[in-house]
Amino acid sequence: MFIYQSYLLISVPSIQVASAPSGTQACTFDIEKFHRTCPVHPAHKPWLVVQGLSDKFYIDHTHPFGAAAASSNAGMIANTVVDIWQAEGVKPILKYKDDLKIFRYPVDAGIFQHDEFKYKYDRDEALSRISSLLVPWHKDKGDLSFSYITNFIGFCWDLPKKRVSLPEEKRLKFHNRVRIFLDSFTGRRCSLLDVQKIHGSLCHVAFVYVQGRSRLPSLSNFIASFMDNEFALRYPPHSMITDLKWWLSTLDNPKFYRKLLPRSPCHDMGLFVDASTSWGIGIIVAGKWTAFRLHQNWKVEGRDICWLETVAVEILLYILEAMNINNTTLLIHSDNQGTIGSLGKGRSRNFHINLSIRRAYVVLASQFITPELVYVASENNPADPISRGELGSLESRITVSFSLPDELQHVFLDVS
């Protein structure tokens, strides 16, 4: 599953690339033998003895992971590289453990030229400003010069076109990994390790394949069913096989990329949603309302109030799509924390909620809408009475026309 730290790791270069001015270039550096390159001072070794499982004691000569959350002793030196570079005007800089990426922007008075652009530094000049640190740079990894297209943390970043994709080698690697899993375990039992390996790979690439996020819960739910028993063998469920076939088909496209857009200011259009199991869904857009009354047979296993609240957001997105709202960040108010959390993550363990999120993300991707869901107390939610059948005036009713997906056609009696 996605972790918040991983999200931040990827979101920072995304913002950097999306907002990069014309002519921006980047260069990647890799520190060789990162966790073994900074030995412990001999006088400190008596205090760095560790006990192994066999009750033997070992001296830690390199102390690779630090005495605190410092990304190892070498990590502190890497941080020094960043600090000096920034003080010397070599910035902005991105760093993840042993990987460092520096950018350069065009300037009017630069002495280094590439195409029609001038810059303050090139690769050699940047390295000269930290040469006294004697950092052992990897000879085969990293870039030999600044360029417009560069790899970093496993992704290919295209600065002029402002998009991100998988490097071809990795796309083929992950495509092959999914294919082998399907060939090996469709209708056959697999181990916990087998699922964890494919799940971890797809979690990573889901940053590029955003609509794939909702194709991950079937794997994480299956992992949970093992209850940490690494020796158990289980049959992959049909839902997981279906999701993996989607991944196989999607990874088959060598031209797939994710467009990166600068994050726009968050706009408050007065968007409110609410749901009631006793009546239906209420939606407010800029003071106008619409409502969807539930069919009496709407509730089946897995469809609960949280699902209904999520569907309310989904339907709101169809309304915004019909209004041709796009390329924006929008504030959306909901009084259900479960819905806010699930849509924020892009997935849910609940099958029906997950399908709703999947449909919602199709609209978000096509309209380039970034939702900012915030909690509003029910008593302060103007959509609350609408969801309970207390409708507004006909003059203040939303009049845009749109169609519900087939999965929701029989959930509601009518659109009031």
What name fits each language-model region?
Residues 10-18, 77-86, 307-329, 358-366:
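Metal-dependent nuclease catalytic cores in nucleic-acid-processing enzymes
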Residues 28-32, 66, 89-114, 148-156, ...:
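Catalytic palm active-site di-aspartate
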Residues 55-80, 285-311, 338-347, 351:
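A short, polar/acidic, helix/strand-boundary loop motif
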Residues 71-125, 316-334:
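Active-site palm subdomain of RNA-directed nucleic acid polymerases
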Residues 144-260, 384:
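C-terminal reverse transcriptase regions that engage the nucleic-acid substrate
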